[in-house]
């Protein structure tokens, strides 16, 4: 319903026609003489007859009221009873009958006269100039005393009045007299209309000082000295007829009685009864409202106390849990070490006893030659064993029949041993896991057999110690040796991935620039390959091409996976990519970061003890034991060191046990020792068959020698060398490029490729010729342009631009004479192609060939929930500040924006919508703005975007429920509107849910700065549109789509429903002026909720569509 400037519609008459007729429709069947009215029995019969007529006629006009006034009348019978049910106090009817000497019914207005009155209100007539449309009784030629305000006349005795007649005005000119108390007589008609409940309509008294008829605002007509003050003259909205409303601080049980409010009670304007105050509220005599500020203060103190506890104790909860885990872990480690020490000591004693027995037997057998030759060998084996390693363990004496019999009696199940150790920690029996035992798989525990955390830690550390012992025995272990070791100690084998690339070229679309050209080689499993080259050589582009993505580029050539032309994306579940930036959650500990990645990316059917082993192995190999329980830290809150953070960044990919691991400059910013520690961990992964490729910048010689293969790139993405590190110096020496003594070879080669150093003239080669020499050396086909113009080769190719991880080098398109406009157009086309390819990559899908089943959406959703719960607890201080701001906003708005009865508190609710929308949007931006890089990395790794989004939204539902309560606890108790707390709370929940979804979309689409500006601008602008009073169809149409409009309507309607009786006209006028409907309260909540759902769908679509992979 659109807005209108007037308060009342043209068809407003039927409502009041019903109200009047329902009371006044009677047959003149009762004696109208004064003595009949003095009879109590007759009075009861008279009242009973009136109310029977009312109940019968209600159904007749119910359809008309619903059709014409449905926007402000919810239940016709209920609203009628609230306004005109005088059954409890009918005294004013009997009093009027006595005053009019029995002709009251001939003074009551018909439907036609009621129509004249309300049509006058429609025309804008107010109290000061209340001239109604001329009619049969009051016009320019006939103006009697009954036409004056507060007066009425009667019809002739022989005239039968039809109160239902809404077309003909009866002649009513006889015996004009003041209006009865409890009725009002408008100026311009000569009849009476009953005042509604909640009104106070006594007979007026002349105030000789002001000349007004108190308590009303009309004056006596001039030139009529015998005219006196009558009754009430108007009933309209409170702004036009406030004098007939029962005043605040008093209550009116009937329209002729007004009583002051007693102590302990309060009475609002238009009250028919006094209301009890709450226990802690202060209500003095004549209180207009109860002072419930004490409840607000108590609630404020309670919430403040809880927030302080949350503020100070949130970290302690997680810290206590971490300490308990650390104790369990340390206990497991110590138990494993003690068990191994006991086993070694027991083995040594058994060997000593056996040798002593054999020595004694040798003496008794006169030094048998065979015994004398066997003893030194056994003693030598004992003396050579190291006390700190498993080398001291005895060999398995499988040939001994006694040993075979003993094995059958022994308990070899690790689970039983673990239970024994837990129950009997001092028992000398411990882990009986001997290195070299070929049957160790039979003794190893199954994942389902280990239940407690202590058991899993002991199992993990036992395996790690065995692996350390095996590596100590085989320091120069090869890949084939690892396979053999894996068979011995049950290391799970990983699928192998070999990546071969042949004549690979990458050209930037729109500009035709070569980012890489004629790249041929391969990456083998079990080897660590280093990619080196000067800045702009295309190192990051090369890594991007390996992952099967080159947005905005044309990629030619072949990439073979295990000798087949397949998409590398089909293996993304077993491919790890470590970005150059350390994208790690700063508000999680080192262990929590690693565990989350392991849970989401390891096989779903992998037992938890095996996952514990994987995580503990990575922590051990990366040297992160001492900081495992430390927060990684952020820019604002310092955590672990930069080198440790870099290792955690690598560990996120190692814990998923990849088959292909790609790292972009993992050693940048690390010192030599940290780099060696990281590379040793990577070499251990390579020994398990992992194909590792990493970009490095000028490594030290020690680090350089730890690589297996080297890929050396020149500017323009051309290969100068690809092969074993051990043969790189030999190859360049064959070209006449010899590394001087005491010079690091990689530094020397990169300086030559950069052009800083020039090869000796005797070599007869320049740095621009090195890529061609490599092609010729290996017999690769060389493009004709490179053969003909070696000098211009470098300038014809470009390096990486900013979109590919580097800066552009080489020639620029504008150098060949292209105009500025042409160059600009090429840049635009290139950017469009990049965006287009990104969108295609986001929605493209390839088959899964990794043969790894990771946890599903629901399981990942649970993992995300757990992670977000920890993050929210650690961000409790930020959350406490948000709540305190909401509390202050509620206090300020509740104090300053008092509820206005004329507008049903619309102004205060307008401020509420703006404040709550703004504050909740800004805080909701943090859900996605701060984690964009983390989401992009996790999504690229194959984690579920739906699980991520739903978990974020689920955790934010805590704020959706609590924040309205925090704000309302202050606003409601300081403002105290008539609507219930429940209604306001439900509206605020729907509002917060709606604006949170909008904030998600803004956070995903924009950077944090612009997103905050939009969050501030939208609530203000949309609220202005929703409250605009201009008769503009376009604005009205836009307003219908604004969430602020539905929130305001819900607030106002919930409040307007509490205004009944004398407030009926005010309610209908205010709702019509704003275009609200009293029945739209559920509809408003549905629209707010639907807006929140649709905005979340839009946010999820934008998150998936515009992510950067």
Swiss-Prot record:
Domain ABC transmembrane type-2: start-end pairs: 859-1056
Transmembrane segments: 5-25, 291-311, 879-899, 904-924, 954-974, 986-1006, 1008-1028, 1084-1104
Gene Ontology cellular-component terms listed: membrane; pollen tube tip; secretory vesicle
GO MF, any single term: ATP binding
Keywords: ATP-binding, Membrane, Nucleotide-binding, Transmembrane, Transmembrane helix, Transport
Disulphide-bridged cysteine pairs: none
This protein's name: ABC transporter G family member 28
Provenance organism: Arabidopsis thaliana (Mouse-ear cress)
Organism taxonomic ancestry: Eukaryota, Viridiplantae, Streptophyta, Embryophyta, Tracheophyta
């Amino acid at each position: 319903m659109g807005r209108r400037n007037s308060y009342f519609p043209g068809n407003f008459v039927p409502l009041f026609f019903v109200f009047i007729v329902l009371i006044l429709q009677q047959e003149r069947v009762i004696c109208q003489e004064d003595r009949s009215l003095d009879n109590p029995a007759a009075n009861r019969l008279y009242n009973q007859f009136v109310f029977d007529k009312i109940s019968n006629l209600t159904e007749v006009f119910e359809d008309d009221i619903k059709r014409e006034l449905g926007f402000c009348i919810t239940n016709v019978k209920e609203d009628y009873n609230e306004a005109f049910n005088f059954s409890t106090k009918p005294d004013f009817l009997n009093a009027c009958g006595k005053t009019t000497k029995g002709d009251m019914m001939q003074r009551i207005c018909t439907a036609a006269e009621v129509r004249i009155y309300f049509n006058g209100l429609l025309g804008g007539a107010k109290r000061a100039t209340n001239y109604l449309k001329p009619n049969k009784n009051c016009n320019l030629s006939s103006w009697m005393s009954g036409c004056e305000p507060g007066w009425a006349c009667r019809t002739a005795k022989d005239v039968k009045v039809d109160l239902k007649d809404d077309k003909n005005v009866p002649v009513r000119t006889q015996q004009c007299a003041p209006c009865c108390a409890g009725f009002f007589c408008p100026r311009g008609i000569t009849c009476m209309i009953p005042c509604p409940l909640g009104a106070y309509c006594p007979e007026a008294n002349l105030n000789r000082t002001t000349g007004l008829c108190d308590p009303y605002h009309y004056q006596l007509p001039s030139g009529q000295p015998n005219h006196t003050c009558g009754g009430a003259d108007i009933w309209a909205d409170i702004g036009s007829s406030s004098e007939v409303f029962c005043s605040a601080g008093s209550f009116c049980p009937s329209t002729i009685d007004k009583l002051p409010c007693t102590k302990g009670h309060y009475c609002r304007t238009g009250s028919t009864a006094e209301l009890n105050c709450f226990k802690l509220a202060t209500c003095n005599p004549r209180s207009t409202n109860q002072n419930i500020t004490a409840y607000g203060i108590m609630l404020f103190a309670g919430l403040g106390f809880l927030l302080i506890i949350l503020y100070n104790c949130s970290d302690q909860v997680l810290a206590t849990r971490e300490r308990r885990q650390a104790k369990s872990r340390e206990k497991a480690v110590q138990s494993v070490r003690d068990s191994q020490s006991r086993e070694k000591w027991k083995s040594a004693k058994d060997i000593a006893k056996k040798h002593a027995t054999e020595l004694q037997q040798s003496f008794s057998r006169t030094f048998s030659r065979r015994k004398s030759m066997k003893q030194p060998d056994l003693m030598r084996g004992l003396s050579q064993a190291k006390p700190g390693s498993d080398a001291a363990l005895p060999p398995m004496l499988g040939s001994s029949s006694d040993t075979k019999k003993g094995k059958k009696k022994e308990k070899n199940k690790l689970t039983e041993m673990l239970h024994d150790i837990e129950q009997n920690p001092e028992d000398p029996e411990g882990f009986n896991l001997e290195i070299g035992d070929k049957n160790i798989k039979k003794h190893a525990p199954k994942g389902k057999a280990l239940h407690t955390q202590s058991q899993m830690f002991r199992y993990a550390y036992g395996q790690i110690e065995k692996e350390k012992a095996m590596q100590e025995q085989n320091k120069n272990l090869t890949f084939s040796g690892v396979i053999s070791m894996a068979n011995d100690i049950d290391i799970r084998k990983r699928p192998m991935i070999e990546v071969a690339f042949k004549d690979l070229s990458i050209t930037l679309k729109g500009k035709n620039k070569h980012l890489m050209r004629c790249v041929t080689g391969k990456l083998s499993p079990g080897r660590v390959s280093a990619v080196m080259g000067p800045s702009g050589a295309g190192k990051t582009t090369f890594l991007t091409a390996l992952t099967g993505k080159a947005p905005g580029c044309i990629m030619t050539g072949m990439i073979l996976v295990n000798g087949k032309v397949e998409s590398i994306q089909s293996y993304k579940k077993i491919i790890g990519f470590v970005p150059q930036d350390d994208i790690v959650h700063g508000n999680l500990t080192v262990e929590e970061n690693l565990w989350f990645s392991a849970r989401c990316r390891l096989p779903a059917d992998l037992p938890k003890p095996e996952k514990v082993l994987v995580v503990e192995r990575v922590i051990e190999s990366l040297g992160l034991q001492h900081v495992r329980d430390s927060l990684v830290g952020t820019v604002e809150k310092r955590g672990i060191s930069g080198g440790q953070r870099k290792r955690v960044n690598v560990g996120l990919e190692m814990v998923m046990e990849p088959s292909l691991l790609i790292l972009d400059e993992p050693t940048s910013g690390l010192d030599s020792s940290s780099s060696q520690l990281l590379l040793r961990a990577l070499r251990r992964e390579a020994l398990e068959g992992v194909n590792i490729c990493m970009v490095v910048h000028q490594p030290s010689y020690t680090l350089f020698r730890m690589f297996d293969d080297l890929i050396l790139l020149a500017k323009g993405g051309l290969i100068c060398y690809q092969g074993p590190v051990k043969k790189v110096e030999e190859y360049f020496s064959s070209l006449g490029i010899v590394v001087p003594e005491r010079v690091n070879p990689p530094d020397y080669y990169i300086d030559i490729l950069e052009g800083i150093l020039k090869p000796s003239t005797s070599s007869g080669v320049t740095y621009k010729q090195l890529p061609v020499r490599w092609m010729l050396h290996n017999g690769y086909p060389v493009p004709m342009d490179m053969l003909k113009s070696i000098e211009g080769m470098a300038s014809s190719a470009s390096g990486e631009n900013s979109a590919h991880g580097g800066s552009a080098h080489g020639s620029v398109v504008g150098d060949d004479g292209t105009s500025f406009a042409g160059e600009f157009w090429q840049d635009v086309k290139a950017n469009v192609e990049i965006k287009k390819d990104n969108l295609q990559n986001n929605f493209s899908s390839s088959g899964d060939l990794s043969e790894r089943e990771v946890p599903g959406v629901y399981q990942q959703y649970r993992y995300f929930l757990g992670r977000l719960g920890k993050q929210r607890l650690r961000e409790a201080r930020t959350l406490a500040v948000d709540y305190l701001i909401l509390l202050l906003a509620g206090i300020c708005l509740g104090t300053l924006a008092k509820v206005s009865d004329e507008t049903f508190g619309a102004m205060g609710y307008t401020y509420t919508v703006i404040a709550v929308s703004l504050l909740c949007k800004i805080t909701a931006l943090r859900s996605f703005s701060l984690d964009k890089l983390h989401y992009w990395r996790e999504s690229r790794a194959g984690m579920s975007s739906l699980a991520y989004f739903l978990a974020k939204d689920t955790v934010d539902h805590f704020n959706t429920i609590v924040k309205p309560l925090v704000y309302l606890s202050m606003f409601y108790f300081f403002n105290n509107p008539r609507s219930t707390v429940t209604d306001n709370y439900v509206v605020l929940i729907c509002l917060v849910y709606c604006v949170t979804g909008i904030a998600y979309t803004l956070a995903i689409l924009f950077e944090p700065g612009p997103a905050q500006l939009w969050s501030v601008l939208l609530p203000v602008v949309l609220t202005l549109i929703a409250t605009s009073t201009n008769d503009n169809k376009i604005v009205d149409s836009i307003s219908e789509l604004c969430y602020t409009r539905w929130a305001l309507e819900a607030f106002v309607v919930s409040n307007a429903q509490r205004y009944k009786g004398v407030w009926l006209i005010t309610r209908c006028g205010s709702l019509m002026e704003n275009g609200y409907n009293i029945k739209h309260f559920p509809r408003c909540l549905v629209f707010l909720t639907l807006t929140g759902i649709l905005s979340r769908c839009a946010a999820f679509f934008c998150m998936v569509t515009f992510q950067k992979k």
